Swiss-Prot record:
Molecular function GO terms recorded: histamine receptor activity
Gene from which the chain derives: HRH1
Extracellular side of membrane: 1-29, 90-97, 165-188, 441-446
Protein name, per record: Histamine H1 receptor
Organism in which the protein naturally occurs: Pan troglodytes
PANTHER family for this protein: 5-HYDROXYTRYPTAMINE RECEPTOR, HISTAMINE H1 RECEPTOR
């Protein structure tokens, strides 16, 4: 049986070398292998789409690009591969010109959409790593969907030359009815130009983006290691009372945590004077703030305040006044410290909400002393300033912690992108190198090698859904749940 030439992304039957024959017993094992690859491709990509649809943890902006890539791969496995196998079994194309144009259109569109989906996924990862918190505000499902639609729109532009090349170029090419090929199959300049736009240029840009991603993640890891070498991590923060021995520190030599727990003495220019004729009534202060639903900060308590009845000379009347008891002026926390349990499982949408809550803090508030009321305002502002001071510090470190969590997630996402790009380049580069050779040397064609490079590009659609669970724990758990696989 004659082995026909196969359709491909940017070339249709350009390989015009000597025909080789293959007996049916020799051809059937190849057909079985290719059919198995086709079925596996369809099954795995359907599994990815069902997993994203059924698991809420996978409803993230980043996975929209994965869905786009999976849809393109599904078209390759469900339409392009089977018709290529059918064409392989036939000695000539006998299914008619309309079905041929449909197959060619799906081949070009799906393969290009797969390439562009990897490209926009790479851009998304690049921006997430370079500007994590700023890009999170921009990174919405609406914008991601618009980007994906743009990529598919560009891919569908292939339909124009496939269906109307002779009409627009006003040239008539010799068309063989027993072959399924485009009207521009012998136009070298057009095929080289589209190869550069469809593959070489996106690939070079992706390599540049990924180099930047790798550099940014590496620098971030080195920066965090440097910080962790001198400061405790956010999950280890536990505010402790003042050192009873009162070890003296030189100005400017205090660590940030010592500044955080330091009492702002004399912040208002004086200390609180209690009335000698009255006894201070101590009571435990209520909770300053409680974030029961927050996954990073569980519950923080303020220090105890004293309700001190005071009488001032200026007013001549007594009233209750909130003052700081210096003997209880430390910040108390829960025995478990700051609860960070479950922070690693925060979804991207939750991370977006949390990161937006950590807004830029205002500058520290200074106090002014009025004549006759200086000591009274001093005590009040000391307590309030200490609360504000501590809260601003906690929000500042919480912001850094959220940024750190985001970078850890992006490091894993960058790893996933690295595997996807490696599979993409390894699968497609042999075909495009071979294509550039035969584009200028039509006699330099080995028919079996040509077919091998075509199917190697198709196999990229089979490998992509295998990469997701290897690099994403949520995909892995969802796949096991759907397939009823017990760990």
């Amino acid at each position: 049986m004659s082995l026909p030439n196969s359709s491909c992304l940017l070339e249709d039957k350009m390989c015009e070398g000597n025909k080789t024959t293959m007996a049916s017993p020799q051809l059937m094992p190849l057909v079985v292998v290719l059919s198995t690859i086709c079925l596996v491709t369809v099954g795995l990509n359907l599994l990815v789409l069902y997993a994203v649809r059924s698991e809420r943890k996978l409803h993230t902006v980043g996975n929209l690009y994965i869905v786009s890539l999976s849809v393109a791969d599904l078209i390759v496995g469900a339409v392009v591969m089977p018709m290529n196998i059918l064409y392989l079994l036939m000695s000539k194309w006998s299914l008619g010109r309309p079905l041929c144009l449909f197959w060619l259109s799906m081949d070009y569109v799906a393969s290009t959409a797969s390439i562009f989906s990897v490209f926009i996924l790479c851009i998304d990862r690049y921006r997430s790593v370079q500007q994590p918190l700023r890009y999170l505000k921009y990174r919405t499902k609406t914008r991601a969907s618009a980007t994906i639609l743009g990529a598919w729109f560009l891919s569908f532009l292939w339909v124009i030359p496939i269906l109307g090349w002779n009409h627009f170029m006003q040239q008539t090419s010799v068309r063989r009815e027993d072959k399924c090929e485009t009207d521009f199959y012998d136009v070298t300049w057009f095929k080289v130009m589209t190869a550069i736009i469809n593959f070489y240029l996106p690939t070079l840009l992706m390599l540049w983006f990924y180099a930047k991603i790798y550099k940014a993640v590496r620098q971030h890891c080195q920066h965090r290691e440097l910080i962790n070498g001198s400061l405790p991590s956010f999950s280890e923060i536990k505010l402790r009372p003042e050192n009873p021995k009162g070890d003296a520190k030189k100005p400017g030599k205090e660590s940030p945590w010592e500044v955080l727990k330091r009492k702002p003495k004399d912040a208002g220019g004086g200390s609180v004077l209690k009335s000698p004729s009255q006894t201070x009534k101590e009571m435990k202060s209520p909770v300053v703030f409680s974030q029961e639903d927050d996954r990073e900060v569980d519950k923080l308590h303020c220090f105890p305040l004293d309700i001190v009845p005071m009488q001032t000379a200026a007013e001549g009347s007594s009233r209750d006044y909130v003052a700081v008891n210096q003997s209880h002026g430390q910040l108390k926390t829960d025995e478990q410290g700051l609860n960070t349990h479950g922070a690693s499982e925060i979804s991207e949408d939750q991370m977006l909400g949390d990161s937006q809550s950590f807004s830029r803090t205002d500058s520290d508030t200074t106090t002014e002393t009025a004549p006759g009321k200086g000591k009274l305002r001093s005590g009040s502002n000391t307590g309030l300033d200490y609360i504000k001071f501590t809260w601003k510090r906690l929000r500042s470190h919480s912001r850094q912690y959220v940024s750190g969590l985001h970078m850890n997630r992006e490091r894993k996402a960058a790893k996933q992108l690295g595997f996807i790009m490696a599979a993409f380049i390894l699968c497609w580069i042999p075909y495009f190198i071979f294509f550039m050779v035969i584009a200028f040397c039509k006699n330099c064609c080995n028919e079996h090698l040509h077919m091998f490079t075509i199917w190697l590009g198709y196999i990229n659609s089979t490998l992509n859904p295998l990469i997701y669970p290897l690099c994403n724990e949520n995909f892995k758990k969802t796949f096991k749940r759907i397939l009823h696989i017990r760990s």
